[in-house]
Amino acid sequence: MSNRIAVVPGTFDPVTRGHMDILTRTSRIFNTLYVLVANNPDKTPLLPMHDRVDLVGQALEEYGFPRSEPKCDSESDRNGPIVKIHRFEKGLLVDCCKQLGATVIVRGLISADAHREASMAYANRNMSGIETVFILPDPPLSVVSSSMVRQLIALGGDISPYVPACVTRFFGTHSG
């Protein structure tokens, strides 16, 4: 089987159960998956990059992904996909994909983002030939967003139903 490499970009500010649903399902399709923790010039992040990267790593461990690349001699010796976290701080997403050898961008899709996501997918394909695949979140998770979680944090609400346990712990000890 050829090595199918995909990227899943996002700000992950913070990582949610919706993100983890998309990552888990994407890992069943691709051999190598890069989780691109990105800076978005249109957003002011709640968390600095190093905290977002660390929380994504902790969440991946919580969901049963190994923290580092498995050691094996051949492709057939490996159990499951390789999942790596990559900081994506500036530049074009398609250039990062080329650098990583990825041929597919995977995005979770909720209806509120559909038009914007489709526009970006067309632009990325026109610039580079890299395809975008959309995965619909599990229905109970389709309303979960980092924006909603940030609002709950600001208002002192319970975020535990919407985020991995590591995020709940982080904000339990880092609340303002």
Swiss-Prot record:
Q: For binding ATP, which residues are annotated in this chain's numbering?
A: 11-12, 19, 117, 141-147
Q: Which cofactor does it need?
A: Mg(2+)
Q: Name one GO molecular function term.
A: pantetheine-phosphate adenylyltransferase activity
The chemistry this enzyme catalyses reads: (R)-4'-phosphopantetheine + ATP + H(+) = 3'-dephospho-CoA + diphosphate
What residues correspond to the site Transition state stabilizer? 19
Quick one: a GO biological-process term for this protein?
coenzyme A biosynthetic process
* This protein's pathway: Cofactor biosynthesis; coenzyme A biosynthesis; CoA from (R)-pantothenate: step 4/5
Output the Gene Ontology cellular-component terms: cytoplasm
Query: Where does the chain bind substrate?
Result: 11, 43, 93, 107
Q: Which Pfam families match?
A: CTP_transf_like
Listed EC numbers:
2.7.7.3
Location relative to the cell = Cytoplasm
UniProt keywords, alphabetically: ATP-binding, Coenzyme A biosynthesis, Cytoplasm, Magnesium, Nucleotide-binding, Nucleotidyltransferase, Transferase
In which domain of life is the source organism classified?
A: Bacteria
The residues that cross the membrane are none
Oligomeric state and partners? Answer: Homohexamer.
Role summary: Reversibly transfers an adenylyl group from ATP to 4'-phosphopantetheine, yielding dephospho-CoA (dPCoA) and pyrophosphate.
Q: Which family does it belong to?
A: Belongs to the bacterial CoaD family.
Q: What is this protein called?
A: Phosphopantetheine adenylyltransferase
Species source reads Tropheryma whipplei (strain Twist)
Q: Which gene encodes it?
A: coaD
